[in-house]
Design a protein with these regions (language model features):
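A short, exposed loop/beta-hairpin motif centered on an aromatic-Gly-Thr core
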Residues: 531-548, 554
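Rossmann-fold dehydrogenase core element
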Residues: 129-155, 183
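Predominantly a Rossmann-like dinucleotide-binding segment in NAD(P)-dependent oxidoreductases
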Residues: 156-260, 427, 454
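Short N-terminal "domain-start" leader segments
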Residues: 479, 483-528
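Short helix/strand-capping hinge loops at secondary-structure junctions
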Residues: 108, 114-117
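C-terminal helical cap and adjacent loop that interface with cofactors, partners, or active-site loops
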Residues: 327-484
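N-terminal glycine-/serine-/threonine-rich beta1-alpha1-beta2 phosphate-ribose binding loop
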Residues: 1-107, 121-137, 479, 483-487, ...
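Glycine-rich, aromatic-lined ligand/substrate-binding cores of catalytic
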Residues: 207-360
Length: 574
């Protein structure tokens, strides 16, 4: 039995998580939120089928703290134990993420957090940007020691369209030994937030972060996954370094595009809020950005460019909002999504994503998969004859789902979230694991420093730390590919295998039967961030019995960390 604690119950949690709990009949045992919200939460839960759900509150004075107070943490843990909580989902304002991640991991709980992983106040300051990066690595250390799992809700990890794209890219990169050479990512969510909206707490700007840390994080995550695909290539095609040049469009910039007088003119037939009468020329000093634009380059060890990328992430795009009175900021304030991805593998392959909405979720009809529909998502493949005689292929996302899956669904992105939640609650796979976010965090960190540079009137390129002890150590798909393809013509049958993730490398122990030559082979396989991939301590046996004994010995060695000799061998390889 899975018993869930939900931390934070705002518009996003209500639409996504509570819908999922009702649909899948999941036990929501506990909601945690601020004391000021207690009555509203109780009313909402009672009216929506969660009368048995308990509520735990903490004082509003702690909402911006980095750590839960000791007494609050102790009381919350006691409640979680009483209710036998097995999984914890964090859906608070991101400033509170760290305290609950710390609480969950220290107490060996399975935890899922919304993106971004953490933020701090005053995110235009270098101190806060450094703090967010530092917090990520602190969470990693906690996750290493914890018996619980830790995942980040980036639902495109389970989006069938993007899964297909990653599969095709991986196949072409590996087969033709050609890297992804260009990635262009555009996303607009048409969030027209007007001057009187900018003090909001939900997806705020006033703490110094905007689009990049709002929905932008999904595309940082996506970009990092694309870059990792190139890592199967070695030699001069191996990416070891990167940098980014950033520009942003700020709320103050927007006031020069759309002034207070413009608002009065556009909405002259509506009741204008007092804000516009009292603030003729408002300023938003060091508020978060409306739009983020980044030019990224990734280099080999000689300093030559392997991959270029562009990020165009905007709030300041076409919207359906035609009213000045504020509605729900999450999905009912005129937001519409435009998403476009363009990926090149040199002259061999071009993949494009086109996903364009023209209406709000509340205007859903039965026909939503055409251009302009809520579920429009098409993938185009343009092929060089060297890789595919068919010059063009097209996939409609809806064709990848059954009619049964489409019943009672909120959208394809939401189906992806459902798959994520299913796998999180059942510990099925490692997608979205906190340990796989290091490259995304390093890219985010450098992009955020670029925003700081603009606010500080500095014009400079920021380095991206592409390789450290974490950024490439947990790429499950690539590791699986490596092991599956390892001398496939000779190793058709794996009898046993064991995988151990270390800080800077991954160890496998394999017991395989080489059918064509009628012997068993047992070895340790190594994949590490120093570009080493090799087999160690290999032995061959005619006897299955002795092969298995040797396999168990190697399994014991790596499982019990008796690995000093192996580490020396790894060092000698590098």
């Amino acid at each position: 039995m899975k018993n869930i604690a939900l931390i934070g119950i705002g518009p996003h949690a209500k639409r996504i998580y509570l819908h999922y709990f009702k649909k899948k009949k999941v036990n929501l045992e506990l909601v945690v939120d601020l004391e000021s919200e207690k009555n509203n939460i109780r009313k909402y839960l009672d009216e929506n089928g969660f009368k048995k759900t308990k509520i735990f509150t903490l004082s509003d004075k702690y909402k911006d703290d980095e750590h839960l107070p000791e007494d609050v943490s102790s009381n919350l843990l006691a409640v979680c134990k009483t209710l036998e909580i097995t999984h914890l989902i964090i859906s608070t304002e991101p400033k509170a993420h760290f305290m609950y991640l710390e609480f969950a991991l220290k107490n060996n709980m399975n935890v899922l957090t919304d993106k971004p992983i953490t933020v701090a106040k005053n995110m235009t300051s270098l101190h806060s940007i450094e703090k967010v990066r530092k917090q990520y690595y602190e969470i990693l250390e906690l996750a290493k020691k914890s018996k619980g799992t830790c995942k980040v809700m980036c639902q495109r990890q389970y989006h069938r369209g993007y899964e297909k794209i990653k599969d095709v890219l991986t196949d072409v990169v590996n087969k033709y030994k050609m890297p992804i050479t260009n990635i262009d990512i555009f996303h607009s969510d048409g969030a027209w937030e007007m001057p009187h909206d900018l003090g909001k707490e939900n997806h705020p700007y006033k703490y110094g972060y905007g689009k990049l840390f709002h929905s932008g994080y999904h595309f940082i995550d996506l970009l990092s996954d694309f870059i990792k695909i190139n890592d199967s290539l070695g030699g001069i095609k191996k990416i070891v370094d990167g940098d980014v040049y950033s520009k942003v469009f700020t709320p103050n910039d927007e006031m020069n595009v759309l002034s207070i007088e413009d608002y009065k003119r556009l909405f002259k037939n509506q009741e204008i809020p007092d804000y516009y009468k009292e603030n003729e020329n408002p300023t938003f000093k060091k508020y978060g950005e409306k739009d983020y634009h980044g030019l990224l380059s990734f280099y080999n060890k000689e300093g030559f460019t392997i991959t270029t990328a562009t990020l165009n992430l905007i709030h300041n795009g076409v919207s359906r909002r035609s009213w000045i009175e504020t509605k729900d900021f999450y999905k009912s304030n005129g937001r519409i999504r435009h998403e476009r991805i363009n990926i090149e593998i040199g002259h061999l392959l071009n993949i494009q994503v086109h996903s364009y909405q023209s209406k709000e979720i509340s205007d859903r009809t039965d026909d939503e998969e055409k251009v302009g529909g809520l579920e429009h998502f098409d993938i185009y493949f343009f092929n060089n004859p060297l890789i595919d005689k068919e010059p063009f292929k097209e996939i409609h996302l809806g064709d990848m789902y059954s009619e049964k899956e489409k019943k009672e669904f909120l959208g394809y992105n939401e189906l992806s979230r459902e798959r994520f939640l299913d796998n999180f609650l059942n510990n099925i796979d490692c997608k979205g694991d906190i340990r796989d976010q290091a490259l995304a965090i390093e890219i985010l960190y450098s992009c955020a420093k670029g925003i700081h540079n603009q606010y500080a009137n500095k014009n400079k390129v920021e380095k991206i730390l592409v390789r450290n002890d974490y950024t490439y150590r947990f790429i499950s798909k690539r590791l699986k590919q490596y092991s599956d393809n390892l001398d496939k013509k000779f190793y058709p049958k794996t009898i046993n295998n064991k995988i151990i993730y270390k800080d800077i490398y991954t160890l496998y122990v394999y017991e395989k039967f080489v059918e064509k030559q009628n012997y068993y082979e047992v070895f340790i396989s190594v994949d590490d961030t120093k570009n080493v991939a090799g087999n160690l301590l290999t032995k061959r046996f005619k006897s299955k019995f002795f092969a298995h004994i040797y396999y168990k010995i190697l399994e014991y060695i790596i499982s019990n960390k008796k690995i000093s000799s192996i580490e020396k061998l790894i060092e000698s390889y590098s």
